[in-house]
């Protein structure tokens, strides 16, 4: 379930004491270096709660159909709400955007009003924030105030929400409370009960990663490879080269998928120097999840991927990703799973191509052909397309079933030290088409995906526009096997892009400890207290 609606989630937000600036456009904004968009949204929600409570203005906590937090207030109290928020936001970059009338610009609440409209029914409030690199937290991450009409027998809402119609018989509305983000909220019965359309199960994420900069690893790999024949490009430095992409891939999860329960990193490398001990992160060496330890050590990603379902304590539903795959904007769990657990995968337009597996082909192309032959033999159906280079959803139970269905292929792939012409590729695409044919998967056709070859100038030149627009759900920054761009130039441009796209350090990074994760049960630095007092930053900062 999305963090915004989960009754079990009291995940705290980090406290910040960031300066307020005026931008070139004349807008006021707070510099933001620690909060993710989700955390900033919840901080603003609690700020508004405290401001309304301080003014003795009652409200209901509502969930809209997009899981945005909504505070519903009697329309007769709108003038009092405006006065209370103007006072509370006197020194805050809080903006209000009228949603139910088009063409109205957001207004700075401190200037004395919530809307330019004479009768606004839906106003979205948000503190403008600018993160390093220029990432802006705008109205997309705001909290809505909805003004409802409470009549003698009816309640009229300006828009439907996740539970109700626009017109409610008062006798059918049952008050309820919910504890969320460390507070008890008044709401309507059923509003935050898990809905049939919610994804409510735990979802973990697995990354496979290798530190290709480790000279000892490189020496061992080179020595072993001298005894093997590998396919096209499989001996390239790009197969193992890394420039801390994992750090930014993990930041993308922290920023845009707060519903992930745990993250497992499957690796035999020493953990990266920037990674701290953290309860959300578990390092998993191959010996902990390979069924046949005699197959180790391995330098074969297909082998690792064939054993992911054996990772201890991994949830039934999980995602798998590489360190060059990134979440590009906020995502819901429903991007990957249906409420019933059906996985959703993204097909590429690229066809697999004709012919069978051949030792001279790349491991990727060979595995696709082996997958095709295996499924054709088992089901009499032909797969024709590759998958996009993105994070993929998987289910442990289906993977165990596949291992029983194709034991020789799983064993052979596990035993391949390097990518082989006879490997299966479980995560791309054997699992997904097996699950599709057997009714456990469907195609995800709404996702926006971008593949970038960062070893070409054409690919690198896509990055500025990608950062500016941020209009893809997923993107892959692939390190090609036949580079056009010098390695140092590529590294500089890619890292610069990633640092600006994902500027917020994740809580598992070793960073300067000038902030702590905030407890939602304590007041925010600038928020009015609920007992009518004002928070003193010197006392509340810790």
Curated annotation (Swiss-Prot):
EC number: 2.7.-.-
Spans through the membrane: none
Keywords: Exopolysaccharide synthesis, Transferase
GO molecular function: transferase activity, transferring phosphorus-containing groups
UniProt keyword 4Fe-4S present: no
UniProt keyword Repressor present: no
Biased composition regions of type Polar residues, renumbered to the chain: 533-542
Region named Disordered: 522-542
InterPro entries: Stealth, Stealth_CR1, Stealth_CR2, Stealth_CR3, Stealth_CR4
Enzyme class: transferase
GO biological process: polysaccharide biosynthetic process
Protein family per UniProt: Belongs to the stealth family.
Other facts noted in the record for this chain: Stealth proteins are part of a protein family that is conserved from bacteria to higher eukaryotes. Family members were first identified in microbes as proteins that help pathogens to elude the host innate immune system. Microbial stealth proteins are involved in the biosynthesis of exopolysaccharides. Stealth proteins are predicted to function as hexose-1-phosphoryltransferases.
Protein name: Exopolysaccharide phosphotransferase CpsY
């Amino acid at each position: 379930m999305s963090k915004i609606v989960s009754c079990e989630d009291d995940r705290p937000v980090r406290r910040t004491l960031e300066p307020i600036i005026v931008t070139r456009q004349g807008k006021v904004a707070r510099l933001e270096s620690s909060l993710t968009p989700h955390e900033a949204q919840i901080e603003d929600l609690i700020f508004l709660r405290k401001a309304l409570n301080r003014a003795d203005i009652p409200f209901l906590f509502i969930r809209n159909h997009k899981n945005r937090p909504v505070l519903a207030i009697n329309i007769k109290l709108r003038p009092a709400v405006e006065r209370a928020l103007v006072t509370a936001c006197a020194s805050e970059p809080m903006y209000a955007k009228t949603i139910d009338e088009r063409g109205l610009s957001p207004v700075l609440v401190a200037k004395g009003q919530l809307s330019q409209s004479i009768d606004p029914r839906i106003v979205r409030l948000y503190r403008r924030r600018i993160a390093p690199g220029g990432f802006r937290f705008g109205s997309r991450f705001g909290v809505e105030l909805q003004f409802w009409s409470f009549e003698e027998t009816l309640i009229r809402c300006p828009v439907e929400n996740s539970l109700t119609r626009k017109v409610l018989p008062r006798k059918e509305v049952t008050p309820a409370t919910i504890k969320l983000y460390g507070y008890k909220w008044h709401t309507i019965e059923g509003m935050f009960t898990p809905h049939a359309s919610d994804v409510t199960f735990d979802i973990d994420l697995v990354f496979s990663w290798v530190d290709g900069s480790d000279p000892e690893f490189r020496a061992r790999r080179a020595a072993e490879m001298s005894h093997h024949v590998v396919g096209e490009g499989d001996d390239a430095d790009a197969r193992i080269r890394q420039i801390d992409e994992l750090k930014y891939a993990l930041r993308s999860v922290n920023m845009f998928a707060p519903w992930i329960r745990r993250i497992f990193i499957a690796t035999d490398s020493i953990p990266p120097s920037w990674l701290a001990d953290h309860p959300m992160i578990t390092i998993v060496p191959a010996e902990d999840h390979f069924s046949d330890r005699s197959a180790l050590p391995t330098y074969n990603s297909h082998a690792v991927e064939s054993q992911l379902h054996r990772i201890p304590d991994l949830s039934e539903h999980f995602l798998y990703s590489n360190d060059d795959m990134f979440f590009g904007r906020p995502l819901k769990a429903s991007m990957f799973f249906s409420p019933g657990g059906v996985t959703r995968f993204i097909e590429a337009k690229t066809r697999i191509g004709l012919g069978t597996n051949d030792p001279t082909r790349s491991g990727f192309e060979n595995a696709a052909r082996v997958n095709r032959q295996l499924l054709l033999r088992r089901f009499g159906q032909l797969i024709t397309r590759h998958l996009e280079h993105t994070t993929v959803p998987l289910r442990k139970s289906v993977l165990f079933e596949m291992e029983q269905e194709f034991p020789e292929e799983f064993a052979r792939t596990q035993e391949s030290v390097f990518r082989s012409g006879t490997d299966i590729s479980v995560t791309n695409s054997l699992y997904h088409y097996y699950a599709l044919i057997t009714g456990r998967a469907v195609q995800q056709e709404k996702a926006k995906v971008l593949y970038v070859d960062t070893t070409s100038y054409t690919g690198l030149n896509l990055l500025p526009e990608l950062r500016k627009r941020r209009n893809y759900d997923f993107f892959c920054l692939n390190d090609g096997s036949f580079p056009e761009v010098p390695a140092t130039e590529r590294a500089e441009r890619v890292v610069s892009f990633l640092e600006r796209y994902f500027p917020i350090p994740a809580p598992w990074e070793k960073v300067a400890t000038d902030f702590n994760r905030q407890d939602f049960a304590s007041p925010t630095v600038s928020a009015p207290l609920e007992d009518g007092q004002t928070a003193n930053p010197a006392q509340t900062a810790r």
